[in-house]
Amino acid sequence: MFGKGGMGNLMKQAQQMQDKMAKVQEEIARMEVTGEAGAGLVKVTMTGSHSVRKVDIDASLLEDDKEMLEDLIAAACNDAARRVEENQKEKMAEVTGGMQLPPGMKMPF
């Protein structure tokens, strides 16, 4: 099934991919993205591990109703989470060479 040294090469490639994957996972965890809502009136900065680092609220919103502000904060958090997911997909595609994963399967495994 495998030619001479084929299995060894396959194992070496798998180890290299695993090493690259670990590096990318560390890079993703350190990255930060900013999600926005209300045309930038609310901004949420989130890490690649989905931890919220900062919430920035324009002062003009503090005079408005509480419910609208809560909605904008939630929308900004969701936007930041979406951006984290997009960045993760891009970084993982670099490692996997664009190989598509089966639906529902997320990286890292």
From Swiss-Prot:
Cytoplasm keyword on record: yes
Compartment(s) of residence: Cytoplasm, Nucleoid
Record keywords: Cytoplasm, DNA-binding
Gene3D superfamilies (alphabetical): Nucleoid-associated protein YbaB-like domain
Annotated stretches, region: Disordered: 87-109
SUPFAM superfamilies per record: YbaB-like
Domain of life: Bacteria
Gene Ontology molecular functions: DNA binding
A GO cellular component entry from the record: bacterial nucleoid
Protein family: Belongs to the YbaB/EbfC family.
Described purpose of this protein according to its UniProt entry: Binds to DNA and alters its conformation. May be involved in regulation of gene expression, nucleoid organization and DNA protection.
Assembly behavior: Homodimer.
PANTHER family found in the cross-reference section: NUCLEOID-ASSOCIATED PROTEIN YBAB
Xref: HAMAP family: DNA_YbaB_EbfC
Protein name in the entry: Nucleoid-associated protein Shal_1591
Biological source species: Shewanella halifaxensis (strain HAW-EB4)
Lineage: Bacteria, Pseudomonadati, Pseudomonadota, Gammaproteobacteria, Alteromonadales
